């Protein structure tokens, strides 16, 4: 005696049952393998990285923190071979820190009317870097101007434009020369700009005044 309905294996009803069963298994398999997995963001639940996001934003940080085109071994001679649109992104040494990055960008906003100052030290075009290299190579400081530069080196967190003698050092030395000669900047102004423009990564940073 049968206690439940059991169609014959070769009956049309059995074939329909098998087709439905296969379809259900297929749907379940699709859901299992395509289930949306959480994304591991750098800062917990903040938004995903976006190359086009504004400087200092969570999205821009999450993009830049994984970029490696900026590094200690990169020299200006190499950057001169880049196309002007190519970008040098990320930190050269330590991992970028979210809070320090935002503090730096906030500090740099005070210079927004000086177009030669990069707005984001962790994302600079090769074209802008080449312009700063030009200042580095062509501007000769007087003895008084050199004294201002040397004093700025003593005052800055990194002991100069960067933590290492790389493309960034040369670029920001050139920028400092330009600002001293054509804008009359003093050593304190140069040192603070360098601190805001640090691209070495890590937690050290300068607070905006």
Predicted regions and their residues:
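Ser/Thr/Pro/Gly-rich low-complexity linker/stalk segments immediately outside membranes or between
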Residues: 34-56
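Short, thiol/selenol-centered motifs that function as redox-active sites or metal-ligating centers
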Residues: 69, 90-96, 159-172, 204-205
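A cross-kingdom marker for long, charged
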Residues: 155, 178-181, 185-209
């Amino acid at each position: 005696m049968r206690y439940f309905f059991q169609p014959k294996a070769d009956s049309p009803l059995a074939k329909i049952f098998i087709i439905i069963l296969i379809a259900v298994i297929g749907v379940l398999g699709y859901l299992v393998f395509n289930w949306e997995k959480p994304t591991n963001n750098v800062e917990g639940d903040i938004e995903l990285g976006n190359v086009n996001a504004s400087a200092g934003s969570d999205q821009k940080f999450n993009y830049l923190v994984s970029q490696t085109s900026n590094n200690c071994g990169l020299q200006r001679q190499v950057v001169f071979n880049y196309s002007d649109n190519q970008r040098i992104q990320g930190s050269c040494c330590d991992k970028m820190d979210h809070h320090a990055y935002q503090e730096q960008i906030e500090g740099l906003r005070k210079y927004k009317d000086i177009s030669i100052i990069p707005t984001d030290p962790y994302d600079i075009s090769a074209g802008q870097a080449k312009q700063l290299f030009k200042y580095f190579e062509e501007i000769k400081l007087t003895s008084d101007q050199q004294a201002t530069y040397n004093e700025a080196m003593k005052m800055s967190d990194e002991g100069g434009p960067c933590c290492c003698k790389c493309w960034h050092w040369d670029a920001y030395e050139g920028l400092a020369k330009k600002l001293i000669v054509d804008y009359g900047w003093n050593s304190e102004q140069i040192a603070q700009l360098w601190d805001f423009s640090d691209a070495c990564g890590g937690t050290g940073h300068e607070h905006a005044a």
